[in-house]
Amino acid sequence: MYVRHLALTDFRSWSRVELELSPGRTVFVGPNGFGKTNLVEALWYSATLGSHRVASDAPLIRAGAERAVVSTIIVNEGRELAVDLDITSGRANKARLNRSPVRSAREILGVLRAVLFAPEDLALVRGDPGDRRRYLDELATTRRPRIAAVRADYDKVVRQRTALLKTASSARFRGDRGALETLDVWDGHLAAHGAQLIAARVDLVHELAPEVEKAYQLLAPASRPATVRYRSGVEVVEAEAAAGNSDPEVFEAALLDALSRRRDAELERGVCLVGPHRDDLELRLGDQPAKGFASHGESWSMALSLRLAAYELLRADGSDPVLLLDDVFAELDSARRQALAQVAASAEQVLVTAAVGEDIPVDWDARRIEIAMTDSDLGRVSVLSGVTQ
């Protein structure tokens, strides 16, 4: 799989750009703040419908513009697929597949399969559980696009149930049984959708575990062994996951029981205290959690291991995913740079950003695209300043 064409309109610092790409290695070179990362971000957005840098879409739209457009042409086993995404702040994205509109932008998920390495990856180790949940859900969705709908349905249930909890507390004191009966219904929805999401995550973690262990051993052979496991606030869910079981019916029953037991606490606080939106992917080095105990180098090795494991799972599913390397070589020591370069050597397409050419391995044969900034009627925008084959 590779990206043959990338076109952006009013995306970040780019007012308009069209790039013809090819298999092999391409390096986008330019000073920090000149827009090279925006190219990789656009491709990652096309693959996942999310940015690795911001949580909302508003910053993706160039200042002064009403919307941004990301267009790609993907080649997979000789077949071309064109994807167009219209990004409008505060509104649902619109998508086209081979120039035909699709009902939901989620329908384009899985067309571009990519793995991104970026400085933000340190948050997978040092950040909040939400960073690790997002990692799991993005990978699960890339491999099984239907999971995107499961996640969307679950998120909707959590929002609506949370709103109900905020009003049901006072209703209970008034003796209003209607609100509590409605809450029972939403408990069922949360348990059903939550169980499906947990099952997908648990299956994924079981496949990730040996790949993470292997990748970490490659990156840090003298360090402690790396392990991962799924953590849940529901004891039955965690025990079943640890035992290798991922039966949604078991998870659904466990969630319903936990919701019943935590009902009073939820009503008191007005938030959902049970469900996969509170779960975590635990990362351990030896007998210690990586978060809080891993050194800077160990944290980088663990973060890279998670991405390398994702790459190996996607490769095992079929065609090679596109590798996106955003300023990571400058962050790594020589051993980790070499390990990442070895993986990149076998990939069908690698797209890299670097502030200076010296950040790239010296033995790389790569096409080089220079990025610059210029002043225009639209303000300061990014432009292509040169291409070296």
Swiss-Prot record:
It comes from the Bacteria. Keywords: ATP-binding, Cytoplasm, DNA damage, DNA repair, DNA replication, DNA-binding, Nucleotide-binding, SOS response. CDD domains: ABC_RecF (cd03242). SUPFAM superfamilies: P-loop containing nucleoside triphosphate hydrolases. ATP binds at residues 30-37. GO terms for molecular function: ATP binding; single-stranded DNA binding. GO terms for cellular component: cytoplasm. Gene3D superfamilies: P-loop containing nucleotide triphosphate hydrolases, RecF/RecN/SMC, N-terminal domain. The RecF protein is involved in DNA metabolism; it is required for DNA replication and normal SOS inducibility. RecF binds preferentially to single-stranded, linear DNA. It also seems to bind ATP. Belongs to the RecF family. This is DNA replication and repair protein RecF. The lineage of its organism: Bacteria, Bacillati, Actinomycetota, Actinomycetes, Mycobacteriales.
